[in-house]
Amino acid sequence: MKPADWLILQKKVRFGDCDSAGVIHFHNLLKWSHEAWEESIEIYGIPSQDIFPDFSIRKSQIIFPIVNCEANFLAPIKIGDLLKVKIVPHKINTHLFQVNSFFIKNGNKVAEGKIIHCSLDIDSRDKIELPDQLERWIEASNVSTNLKEC
């Protein structure tokens, strides 16, 4: 598998994603940013239940609350637009990681999102080290941060 397989995704803008002006509603950019990194780890080979807690089975003992997020809109994103979503994750320290998402339409960057997550124990809420699987995904992704496919 090539890094582009899990780092460059597609998103089609739907009617329900947009506001009355016909452009995406602002909160959807952060939603799409989060969904993109979730999809990316699954394509990479990490089952989502290994990362995100399922309270019925309690497989994961780690939670990743968002401690910072930003969205920048550089051009209108409208109904029917087909976007490439380029994911660029990196580790900040032992318990923090950041995922940048770049939204590209017709070869031009039209928006970007940034989400920073903190790794916490689900019960104590103490900061803990990022899980090995997530670290491997970040490392494998950073080997190819210069993807030219976009």
From Swiss-Prot:
Family: Belongs to the 4-hydroxybenzoyl-CoA thioesterase family. DHNA-CoA hydrolase subfamily.
Molecular function terms, GO-annotated: 1,4-dihydroxy-2-naphthoyl-CoA thioesterase activity
Keywords, alphabetical: Hydrolase
EC number(s) given by UniProt: 3.1.2.28
Statement: the UniProt record of this protein carries the keyword Hydrolase: yes
Pfam families: 4HBT_2 (PF13279)
Enzyme class, spelled out: hydrolase
Disulfide bonds: none
Claim: Hydrolase is one of the keywords in the record: yes
SUPFAM superfamilies documented for this protein: Thioesterase/thiol ester dehydrase-isomerase (SSF54637)
Pathway membership: Cofactor biosynthesis; phylloquinone biosynthesis; Quinol/quinone metabolism; 1,4-dihydroxy-2-naphthoate biosynthesis; 1,4-dihydroxy-2-naphthoate from chorismate: step 7/7
Gene3D superfamilies on file: Hotdog Thioesterase (3.10.129.10)
Function: Catalyzes the hydrolysis of 1,4-dihydroxy-2-naphthoyl-CoA (DHNA-CoA) to 1,4-dihydroxy-2-naphthoate (DHNA), a reaction involved in phylloquinone (vitamin K1) biosynthesis.
Residue spans crossing the bilayer: none
Active-site annotation: D19
InterPro entries from the UniProt entry: DHNA_CoA_hydrolase, HotDog_dom_sf
Name recorded for this polypeptide: 1,4-dihydroxy-2-naphthoyl-CoA hydrolase
GO biological process: phylloquinone biosynthetic process
Recorded catalytic activity of this chain's protein: 1,4-dihydroxy-2-naphthoyl-CoA + H2O = 1,4-dihydroxy-2-naphthoate + CoA + H(+)
